[in-house]
Amino acid sequence: MRKKVVLSCEECKNRNYSTMKDTSSVERLEIKKFCKTCNKHTVHKETK
């Protein structure tokens, strides 16, 4: 089963992306993606 999660930028805390995640994984998702407000690639973490 997969569930929808929201990713937020670590620098500006803006919620830019949403993605799907497997429910069996316990750790939070961390992906390097482009942030429109920072105008650069930053680490995006899964929010609650």
UniProtKB/Swiss-Prot annotation:
Keyword annotations: Ribonucleoprotein, Ribosomal protein
Taxonomic lineage: Bacteria, Bacillati, Bacillota, Bacilli, Bacillales
HAMAP family linked to this entry: Ribosomal_bL33
NCBIfam families, per the entry: PRK00504.1 (NF001764), PRK00595.1 (NF001860), rpmG_bact (TIGR01023)
Name of the protein: Large ribosomal subunit protein bL33A
GO cellular component: cytoplasm; ribonucleoprotein complex; ribosome
Coiled-coil annotated residue ranges, if any: none
One Pfam family here: Ribosomal_L33
Source organism of this protein record: Bacillus mycoides (strain KBAB4)
